[in-house]
Swiss-Prot record:
It comes from the Bacteria. GO terms for molecular function: membrane insertase activity. Interacts with the Sec translocase complex via SecD. Specifically interacts with transmembrane segments of nascent integral membrane proteins during membrane integration. One of its GO terms (biological process) is protein transport. The gene is yidC. Belongs to the OXA1/ALB3/YidC family. Type 1 subfamily. InterPro entries: Membr_insert_YidC (IPR019998), Membr_insert_YidC_N (IPR028053), YidC/ALB3/OXA1/COX18 (IPR001708), YidC/Oxa/ALB_C (IPR028055), YidC_ALB_C (IPR047196), YidC_periplasmic_sf (IPR038221). Keywords: Cell inner membrane, Cell membrane, Chaperone, Membrane, Protein transport, Transmembrane, Transmembrane helix, Transport. The chain crosses the membrane at residues 13-33, 343-363, 409-429, 461-481, 506-526. Required for the insertion and/or proper folding and/or complex formation of integral membrane proteins into the membrane. Involved in integration of membrane proteins that insert both dependently and independently of the Sec translocase complex, as well as at least some lipoproteins. Aids folding of multispanning membrane proteins. Gene3D superfamilies: 2.70.98.90. Its main location: membrane. This is Membrane protein insertase YidC.
Amino acid sequence: MNQSRRILRTVYLSLFLIGLFMLINDIFSSNILSSKSSDKEVQFDLNKSFDDNEISSVKSNSFNLINKSQDIVVETGIYVATFSTFKGNLVSLKLKNHLNLEKNPTDLINIDRKNETFFDISFDYFVDDLFLYKKIDDFNHEFKAYFKNNGKTYEYVKKYTFSKKDEYLMKFKVTVNGLEDYNLFDFDSYKIIFSSEIERLSDKAKLQYNNYLSQIIYYDNKLKYGKDGLRINNPRWIGSSTKYFGVLVSKENMEVEFKKERGTLKSFIINNVRNKKNISDEFFIYAGPKDNRYLDVFDKRDDNTFGLFDIFFGMSVEKSFWYLIQVPMQMVMQVFYDVIPNWGLSIIFLTIVVRILIFPLTFKGFRATAELSKLQPKMKELQAKFKHDPKKLNEEMGRLYKEEGVNPLGGCLPVILQLPIFFALYSLVNNLFLLRGASFIPGWIDDLSIGDSVYHFGYKLYFVSWTDIRILPFIMMFTQLGSTIVSSNMDLKNLGAQQKFLYFGMPIMFFFILYNMPSGLLIYWITTNIFTILQQYYIKMHLS
């Protein structure tokens, strides 16, 4: 086999593996959990459920209360939180510093207010009136109601405390006290149904973002995904997570159960009240970006308002197999960004640094290819002489390589070496929160975490899943073709049909595969292609 063809096929085998990697990554991401809204099952403790008439009565009363309820808006330095006097729960939580595609604050709560609330508590279904609201101060807000159970009256209080240091965390305290003179509750536990629906997306954003939703739990120093039937005692935290945001709940001595109901996986936080005279439970809720700059402050007591430590919210950021390569890459990108605050330029500079670092290997590989090309006449003679004896041909080829001091695979090493680098950078660019909403060229590449766009269709083309007209995939395709031609040393006029497909068909195929990839990734790929073209011209001049 012609050595140039061997190298060319190695290149495209690498591209195939890249495409396969991205396909598997997308399939895995999109199938972690498919979640949808549904009516909540009315439930008080682990052993009791309501009949249909009771459920109907509760829902009818709830509908009337919703119509009479008022919204309470609380604004902090980072949040715009909206509470409802119906159930005293959060109905909207907007992040002021993190905008969506429409340049509005991202709303982390994505619920149908008529059917559910963000944090459904068993006691809520016994409250037949609206909650009373009291503003204690700018950071503390209280909702109070009363309910009866088995002839006994209870005072029911929900208190929300926001951080004074604008941390993405609030303390949620549930208090239940009996008003009559009796000792213990006559129930063993109560549940909190934690809504899995987070991050409200517009129709346009749903088309642009590969925004998988997953329910996660951290216990035994491991991040796990929720599944039907899983029940864990005393996890460090439980949460719902999208690609860039998370809502995580931590509480001492809680029990968590995942249960699939009506096709939807739900999270239940079970709280034991056996042998208690009153209830006073505190939950710490992180609601914000999946960014370790914000998540890790709750691992050291002195770093946060609430004095929390060893919560490990930072473990909610999924780490890929290539994490050890990603860390120095991100550090280099951050250095460039600190000098020139543009993440697109940081990706370009990082790519150049990587290419310079592997240049000695690239040069060695190209020199091996050039030396091997000089052996073409002798190789053709051997091929003609032993065309009917493949075993003898291989022996003679091996002897020729040894005598001439040539490694026939030397030109393939740089291509193979780039694979882990590419995979690491793909995972970095595809998941790094800092690239979300980061503009490179305003009006064209406005968000490095999604594809570039010069025209938005408003719908998805059926056959190719395109939502926009994009320019970067075309640039990538042509620069990839140029890079391959320059690197291969092949005579285009003498190419067979198979080789022509490798040259022209594969870049076109990868044009479709990469069309909707994040623009940050395509910037890396294009920069690599251009650098490779210039590098090969330099090497050819040097060797000549």
